[in-house]
Amino acid sequence: MSKKLGFALSGLMLAMVAGTASADMDGGQLNISGLVVDNTCETRVDGGNKDGLILLQTATVGEIDAGVLNDTVGAKAKPFSITVDCSKANPNPGSTAKMTFGSVFFGNSKGTLNNDMSINNPSDGVNIALHNIDGSTIKQVQINNPGDVYTKALDATTKSAVYDFKASYVRAVADQTATAGYVKTNTAYTITYQ
């Protein structure tokens, strides 16, 4: 290689390094989450797919008037169900399904789900509560609490079970009013069998 070409390439490399070092830089983070399962049985949210979208009705700030309560749903409660169907499972996973809930990004110590404050114009001071509805019994789901297990026997004939829940708005702090804005959060449910 000639010395002229070597000097030209060296100069180009210095220009690239110098240009990169002096440039302004912007960036951000990507939150990536997922779930890997062995698909022992099929699950469906509201009769659809295993992943569901629960759309709550619009609530006024005044309607979100309390923090989370163990045996009472919050504002604009939306019912939804999760069906576990083991009729096609081979081998049979057992006769009982046990469900828990967790959230990598939005769980908190009250067992509710924080609002995603990274969205445009988020509501501040509001959480989402999930409650299990078992007949006339209402019980708050404790997100990220592995001891908060919802157990159902699989029907002997259909090999299935249906869990009923409600999602609702609650105050993040009981004595602080929520602000107007959008609400978005997520949770994952996990089912084990015995």
Curated annotation (Swiss-Prot):
* Disulphide bond pairs: C41-C86
Signal as a keyword? yes
Quote the Gene3D superfamilies the UniProt record gives: Fimbrial-type adhesion domain
A Pfam entry, by short name: Fimbrial
* Keywords in alphabetical order: Disulfide bond, Fimbrium, Signal
Q: Name one GO cellular component term.
A: pilus
Its UniProt miscellaneous note says: The operon is cryptic under classical laboratory conditions, but is functional when constitutively expressed.
- Write down what this protein is called: Uncharacterized fimbrial-like protein YadN
Species of the source: Escherichia coli (strain K12)
